[in-house]
Amino acid sequence: MFFEYKGANQSIAGAQAEQANNGALRYFFHTLNNALEEEGDFPSELIMQTEQIQIGQATAWMLGRSGETVTLTDPHFGVIDECAKININTAPFEVLELLPTITPEFAAAIIDWRDEDDDVTENGAEATMYSLQTLPYGCKNAPFETVEELRLVYGATVEMIYGEDTNQNGVLDPNENDGMQTPPLDNQDGTLNFGILEHVTIYSKIPTEEEESEGADSDNNSGDQPGNRNSQQEPGGGDEVPFQVNVSTASAIVLACLPGMDEAIAQQIVSYRLANPDPTEGLEWVSEAVDSEDVQQALPYLTDKTQQFTIDLAAIGSNGNGYRRVRYVVDTSGEAPVVLHRRDMQRFGWALGPTLLEQVNTPSQAVR
């Protein structure tokens, strides 16, 4: 009877955790509808609770990112901005090849995977290369539908896609900093080396002035994937830029990939942003942060608004049992928030860091 009793407790706690995750998602929707000052603002942890959200006998957390993520050993809690990433459905080769862990050949293969033709980009891969695989399959020749689809692109490796962050929680877990003792293979340098997955999206989309004037109804009923109609015109009527990045939330790694940027300029922007957490609205502060004419080239690719978010929810039920994790991508460009993608993250294991794990495993300190 003892094991049946324990199993029943786990099942009940798991159901509690699942409902807590559902409740936390509804809480996020409520915040979007009632707490944001302006449409397109980022819902920071200053206006909503993102950790230890008590829902009945369960507790939920929203796993986020911070500017210091590469050295953190416990998670940062918050919402993940999809507009802080590079859109792999629209970014040109020159941007893609600058992403960490990526090779020029893989960047070219991404272009060939998503374009409509069978013409091989220099060093890329079209149908012939895929037909020569041990288990042959076709080249899609259509936009990405998920970022995980990168696994299918010719030349992809697990290390390239995930880096050391195999559970995708954005922090350096013990098994990601122990060399060859436990998976994944890592260099035990005390720093989390991300793969490409951390820095890319297919969902980011900032509406054009024409779309804004048409209203949310036409945008919500268009049926288009957000990442497939993402373009803005450069000031002065120049060429359209294929995507934009939220300079208020993007990492230095992402910013360094943009035209006119490099690692030094990108780090200056992030450092200024961290030192001035409430900068003036718009992009004027970027020119204040960086005294360089090069940054002017990047301005058309920058925005301070966002409408697509990832809500990475982890919860436990009563007595610290029944751990559940699920990730949602939410689009807020219509009249009401819409879930674009849901992914069960349970199989990636514990994502709340060693401190919370110790509390959960210590009855006297268990999170309730």
PLM ranges: what are they?
Residues M1-R368:
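Compositionally biased linear targeting/interaction segments
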